Amino acid sequence: MGARKKISAEKRKEALKTMYFAKLQNVPTSPRKMRLVADMIRGMEVNRALGVLKFSSKEAAARVEKLLRSAIANWEQKNERKAESGELFVTKIFVDGGATLKRMRPAPQGRGYRIRKRSNHVTLFVDSKSNNEDQN
């Protein structure tokens, strides 16, 4: 690794220490379906987001709800106190494509159609309102 790349990697690593996030990797849901759920809660207060996810009929909502609870726990662990109602917000959430498993499905006349079983990675950031205003 080059010197400049190493320096920038260390800066990025230091910046992540001040952020509160949780990652969910290799989720066996297509990224397109997961993004629908991610768009529902982006920018919301965490208690409201948990309520929205709890009553959502999407399968991906249960996974994102568990991830959000993990991010809240990470925030509480780093700050050594409980999160109060209305204090934390979902600042960023993004869904990236993961590994794609390729499978064959029998098709007419001896052919095979390819099926792509997609997976994704979800990264969710939470922060308090006062920290958001300081950064902007």
UniProtKB/Swiss-Prot annotation:
In its keyword annotation, does this UniProt entry include Ribosomal protein? yes
The cross-references to Gene3D superfamilies, in alphabetical order and at most eight, read: Ribosomal protein L22/L17 (3.90.470.10)
Report the GO terms under cellular component. cytosolic large ribosomal subunit
What are the record keywords, sorted? Answer: Ribonucleoprotein, Ribosomal protein, RNA-binding, rRNA-binding
Q: Which domain of life is it from?
A: Bacteria
Q: Which molecular-function annotation in GO is an example for this chain?
A: rRNA binding
Q: Which InterPro entries match?
A: Ribosomal_uL22 (IPR001063), Ribosomal_uL22_bac/chlpt-type (IPR005727), Ribosomal_uL22_bac/org-type (IPR047867), Ribosomal_uL22_sf (IPR036394)
- One Pfam family named in its UniProt record: Ribosomal_L22
Could you confirm whether the keyword Transferase appears in this record?
no
One GO BP annotation of this record: translation
User: What protein family does this chain belong to?
Assistant: Belongs to the universal ribosomal protein uL22 family.
Protein function: This protein binds specifically to 23S rRNA; its binding is stimulated by other ribosomal proteins, e.g. L4, L17, and L20. It is important during the early stages of 50S assembly. It makes multiple contacts with different domains of the 23S rRNA in the assembled 50S subunit and ribosome. The globular domain of the protein is located near the polypeptide exit tunnel on the outside of the subunit, while an extended beta-hairpin is found that lines the wall of the exit tunnel in the center of the 70S ribosome.
Q: Summarize subunit and interaction data from the UniProt record for this chain.
A: Part of the 50S ribosomal subunit.
Protein's UniProt name: Large ribosomal subunit protein uL22
Gene that specifies this protein = rplV
